[in-house]
């Protein structure tokens, strides 16, 4: 999907890790939400409250889910899921343009 139609977008940016991750929240008519943003190159750890589906629009990264030892590489057009009440490590090697869907 190239765009979201009939949504609301929160104007205030979500800024994390001293500006290394910046996103905006998108609210859908059915009550679900997502964030649309960028993560700049570097290594970060994110904690999750609810399950997440991460779609990579462009860029490159490696991800290691909590409790796993292996890293998996992701690039444009790929996605990965993260369980709720968990965390994941991400190493961004090329600025990441992403959509994170909260389930």
Swiss-Prot record:
Record GO terms (molecular function): guanosine phosphorylase activity; purine-nucleoside phosphorylase activity; thymidine phosphorylase activity; uridine phosphorylase activity
Keyword Glycosyltransferase attached: yes
The protein's enzyme class: transferase
Listed GO CC annotations: cytosol
Enzyme Commission number(s): 2.4.2.1, 2.4.2.2
UniProt entry tagged with the keyword ATP-binding: no
Top-level taxon: Bacteria
Secretion signal span: none
Catalytic activity: a purine D-ribonucleoside + phosphate = a purine nucleobase + alpha-D-ribose 1-phosphate; adenosine + phosphate = alpha-D-ribose 1-phosphate + adenine; cytidine + phosphate = cytosine + alpha-D-ribose 1-phosphate; guanosine + phosphate = alpha-D-ribose 1-phosphate + guanine
InterPro entries given in the database record: Ppnp, RmlC-like_jellyroll, RmlC_Cupin_sf
Keywords from the named record: Glycosyltransferase, Transferase
Family classification: Belongs to the nucleoside phosphorylase PpnP family.
Role description: Catalyzes the phosphorolysis of diverse nucleosides, yielding D-ribose 1-phosphate and the respective free bases. Can use uridine, adenosine, guanosine, cytidine, thymidine, inosine and xanthosine as substrates. Also catalyzes the reverse reactions.
Protein name: Pyrimidine/purine nucleoside phosphorylase
Species of the source: Methylobacillus flagellatus (strain ATCC 51484 / DSM 6875 / VKM B-1610 / KT)
